Amino acid sequence: MPSSLLLATRNQILSMMNCWFSCAPKNRHAADWNKYDDRLMKAAERGDVEKVSSILAKKGINPGKLDVEGRSAFHVVASKGNLECLNAILIHGVDITTSDTAGRNALHLAAKYGHALCLQKLLQYNCPTEHADLQGRTALHDAAMADCPSSIQLLCDHGASVNAKDVDGRTPLVLATQMCRPAICQLLIDRGAEINSRDKQNRTALMLGCEYGCKDAVEVLLKNGADVSLLDALGHDSSYYARIGDNLDILTLLKTASENTNKGRELWKKGPSLQQRNLPYMLDEVNVKSSQREHRNIQELEIENEDLKDRLRKIQQEQRILLDKVNGLQLQLNEEVMVADDLESEKEKLKSLLVAKEKQHEESLRTIESLKNRFKYFESDHLGSGSHFSNRKEDMLLKQGQMYMTCTSPGVPAHMQSRSMLRPLELSLPNQTSYSENDLLKKELEAMRTFCESAKQDRLKLQNELAHKVAECKALGLECERIKEDSDEQIKQLEDALKDVQKRMYESEGKVKQMQTHFLALKEHLTSEAAIGNHRLMEELKDQLKDMKAKYEGASAEVGKLRNQIKQNELLVEQFRRDEGKLVEENKRLQKELSMCETERDKKGRRVAEVEGQVKELLAKLTLSVPTEKFESMKSLLSSEVNEKVKKIGETEREYEKSLTEIRQLRRELENCKAKLAQHVKPEEHEQLKSRLEQRAGELAKKVTELTSKNQVLQRDVEKVYLDNKLLNQQVHNLTSEIKSHYVPLQVSEEMKKSHDVTVEELKKQLLDVTQKCADKQLEMEKLLLENDSLSKNVSRLETVFVPPEKHQKEVTALKSSVADLKRQLLELNKKCGEDREKINALVSENTSLKKTLSNQYVPAKTHEEVKTALSGTLDKTNRELLDAKKKWEDLNQEFVKTKDENEILKRNLENTQSQIKAEYISLREHEEKMSAINQNMKSVQDNSAEILANYRKGQEEIVTLHAEIEAQKKELDTIQECIKLKYAPIISFEECERKFKATEKELKEQLSEQMQKYHVREEEAKKYKQENDKLKKEIFTLQKDLKDKNVLIENSHDMERALNRKAEELNKQLKDLLQKYSEIKTEKEKLVDDNARQTSELLAAQTLLQKQHVPLEQVETLKKSLNSTIEHLKEELKNKQKCYEKEQQTVAKLHQMLENQKNSSVPLGEHLRVKEAFEKEVGMIKASLREKEEESQNKTEEVSKLQSEVQDTKQALQKLETREVVDLSKYKATKSDLETQISNLNEKLANLNRKYEEACEEVLRAQRKQLSAKDEKELLHFSIEQEIKDQQERCDKSLTTITELQKRIQESAKQIEAKDNKITELLNDVERLKQALSGLSQLTSPSGSPSKRQSQLIDTLQHQVKSLQQQLADTDRQHQEVIAIYRTHLLSAAQGHMDEDVQAALLQIIQMRQGLVC
């Protein structure tokens, strides 16, 4: 009872609160909302940072202002996760705790939509984590529902309560299990969430997980020790909720968990006794069988693991099947809900029909009663005599007819009324016979028969219409079933098509992978052929690869089209489902119409049966009709009875009138009695009313309990339906996402297949062409080799004789010739050889002449061979030296690795020192807090000084007034003296005046003494203020030193110094002004004292004169009056001055308190001076050491700059060597040795620096240990020293980084030199081979003049080729550097957490560029 009432009241209050909160902001901000707010909202929705910052720069813009819908720009930015806009708003300044109409602040919205970066930023600005919305949910609740583990971790790290409950008593763990988020459940449990926490209905997270069928979450809860045996408020356990959810897997999990708990309890109960009994027996067996058991346990565990894996697979398959079933059941549920709604509407319609039927039944009963009355009247009329009636009788009969008319219902038709009712005046006709009455009855019968026939015809028509409608309904039902079957078939076809598309996609992916492997093989083949020299084929294959890339991109576009088609198919499926729903609704509507028609048919059939029964009754009554004689006798009897009844009616009417008058009187009396009794109540009636009210209250309470129980049941049903809808939406979303990610439409897959088949066929054709070309080229190569052999034989014959020296020199210069041009020349030479075969006879004749010339012009073969051996020996030496250099470089690399490790150790030491600094020294926040406290003190001092100034001004004004009064008194004394000179008065009155004057003098003297005391007090206060100002100045200087020593920025410290100096100067000026005013007041005081002395002397003189002379009475009285007025005036001024004095005393007391506080917080001067001197000495020592270190660091920086210049010189030298493509090994070794010596020197210097740094750190630590007893100033000085050390350390780190960069550059240059050396050696080998072949060919084919020209042409072409190759290398280097730059920038942005769409697109570009480089 109370819980249900509380729930009802809570729901009402919540609804009221929602309404109030929804209405409040609309009324508040409707008038405040302007165009700039609208622009800011639009910019926030678009995420335009520049626009947002420009609008915020204007005055009066509040980003936390709510619009008509109850949300602000700040909330929109947080919900959309735009970090830059959020930064701009936070920097501008906004109330972080502002909430929207639902009570959610920006932290709630960022957690709800899973924006972890925005959430982190808000937490950095100290946004409260425990703020709850109108549903009582914190940001952790929203993060748990949004499935965002990073935001949950952030909130927990910043102190969010894991066990916070909402209005329904649900924790974040409960909501995570409801939403089926097992990972988040585990995370919350790890963070300390209560597993067995209950909501307001005493349901645990396990119960809700079982109800919503979340197996993974239930597993997580059971693993972490959730209690299975707990019961909710209704007495249900978790297995009951698992049965409601129809999830067998969860039931099995719960059973196993409960069995394990029971087993554990039983073992706990039975364990001690069994162990006590079996201990002596078990010890021997355990020692023997321990090894066997371990082996068996391992085997069993392996078998169990395999079984569990199989079970997991089966369970996953079953889960998928169950998900499909769940989807089907949910659809059925939706249909059943629709059917239930339709049944409820039909119930309401049937109720309305029942009410109408009851009304019709009542009307039919009335009509039957009226008919019975008519038949009775007809019988009485028929049995009466035929005598004539008087006028009275006729009147009576007319009255009776009217009475019967009133009894009958107005809806009865005319043919159903009797003859007496239709024509009541027939009785008055004297010559009417029974024959005419019988004719009328027959006519009425005929009319009734015609009516019955028409009713039968109507019934037949209705039956035909009903049959027609039934047939239509059946046809519609068949159509609905057929449409359902068609839609099911279409859905199945679409599912099959999606499966086929999946298969084709997998096949296409496999084909793509095969193609990629094929492409890689082709690339390798092409690279091998490029080494041989097939540049044309390379270019053709590159073009083919580009074409293939274009086709691949087209295929990816087709895949995109296929995905779009899948989406269209999904939309079609949804349309089919909607059409099915519409058809089901139409079917239900037709069924309703059919039921209505059937009910109408039943009604009309009943009416027809009733009419037939009435007709039969009429026929039976007509058979029992009476003859005319009896009828006339009956008439006479009736007339006599009517006369008697008329008399009786007259008497009754009179009595009725009397009774009416009596009743009126009684009513009046009753009303009077009621009016009297209204004021009094009987105790019996009171008790009766009490009992009735108690009964009524009990009934109402029962009704309330029933209604509350129904309300609870309905709420549960609503919650279940809501959660079912949520689950359905999630499943639909998951299905759509799976279809989008995994499925492809049929058309797209077929197009992909076709395109891939076409590309494969084209590639096959290209491969066949390439293979044919390769075969042709191999045949040509074989021919060329054969010809080469023949030529080499001829060349060997020629070389046995002589080698010319000129050709030898030309061959040495032509070392940079390429393979491709030589092959082309070989082809041309072969052609020319074919042409010149005819000229062989001529060449034989020329051979004899050439042999003669060879002896004179060419070098012998021996010298040539000796030169060759020498060159080969030098090449071997260079190779050996290169290998030695490589080994040395490897050693250097190892040394560099060691130095890197040492650098890492130094970095760790740095981090440790930083942590020590953080632990031992004050942070910026504390410094800022101290500064704020000092500023507050300064403000309070300024306020006090302002109050003192105001009091001083008031004192000046009072002094001015006193001056004026003194002058007035002087004037009055002058007048008195003149009066005394003119007239005289008696001595007695004068003595009285004297006494008064003395009293006034005393009072004035007392006032003057009090003012003097006040002025002395003020002087002392001024001195104190001076001392306080001096102390403040000293504190300001100490603070300035602290600011300089700490990590505060220099600019801020300078600004603070300037501001404080200004304030100090202002205070000094104020003090100077006060001192000047004080000196003026002193002078004025002295003047007043002199004036007072003069006045006293004058008064004494006047007294002496008065003693000698008499004064008149009139003058004395005037003097009395004037003196009394002056005395009253002076008293009022004294009161005012006393008030001012009290105020000043209060201010002085406040200042004293301030001074005492400052004294308590401050240090005495002696100690301060001692500490200061000690610190100054230490600072001097440390500064001297720092200067030495700075000089050393400057020397090191100079050395580093020298090294950098040397490295640049080496780079330039290397570039020159690259242009020449020849490296002097001796210079290289010299530079290498120099660099090694420099590196060793730098390493030694680094070691020295590290030692010095460690020594400095030790010195600092010693100083810290000595000065731990000192106060804050000592620590501040230490901090300044360590800051300077840090600066030097940063410089050292910079120098180390420059050294490492130099080392890296040296390594890179060495690698480049090695690669170039290798290339040079390869080129030299190729050139030597080609040289030999060229020499032979030139001797064979060309005459004496032609070889020089051809060789020059060859050299030119080779140089061009070398230049083109160099350009290509430079272009590739540029591309590589650009790629590296892009890669670094995007990696940095990704590391910082800025993974926006632009960054993702850039990363895709990087991958594509990388693939392009690989290609």
UniProtKB/Swiss-Prot annotation:
This is Uveal autoantigen with coiled-coil domains and ankyrin repeats. The keyword Ubl conjugation applies. There is a cross-link at residue 1034 (Glycyl lysine isopeptide (Lys-Gly) (interchain with G-Cter in SUMO2)). It is found in: Nucleus; Cytoplasm; Cytoplasm, Cytoskeleton. It comes from Canis lupus familiaris. Transmembrane segments: none annotated. Keywords: ANK repeat, Coiled coil, Cytoplasm, Cytoskeleton, Isopeptide bond, Nucleus, Repeat, Ubl conjugation. Residues 1186-1201 have a biased composition (Basic and acidic residues). Its main location: nucleus. Component of the apoptosome complex, composed of APAF1, pro-caspase-9 and UACA. In the complex, it probably interacts directly with APAF1. Interacts with LGALS3, ARF6 and ACTB. Interacts with RAB39A. Pfam families: Ank, Ank_2, Ank_4. Residues 288-376, 759-1381 form a coiled coil. Disulfide bonds: none annotated. GO terms for cellular component: cytoskeleton; cytosol; nucleus. GO terms for molecular function: actin binding. PROSITE patterns: ANK_REP_REGION (PS50297), ANK_REPEAT (PS50088). PANTHER family: ANKYCORBIN, UVEAL AUTOANTIGEN WITH COILED-COIL DOMAINS AND ANKYRIN REPEATS. Residues 1186-1205 are annotated as: Disordered. One of its GO terms (biological process) is intrinsic apoptotic signaling pathway in response to DNA damage. The keyword Hydrolase does not apply.
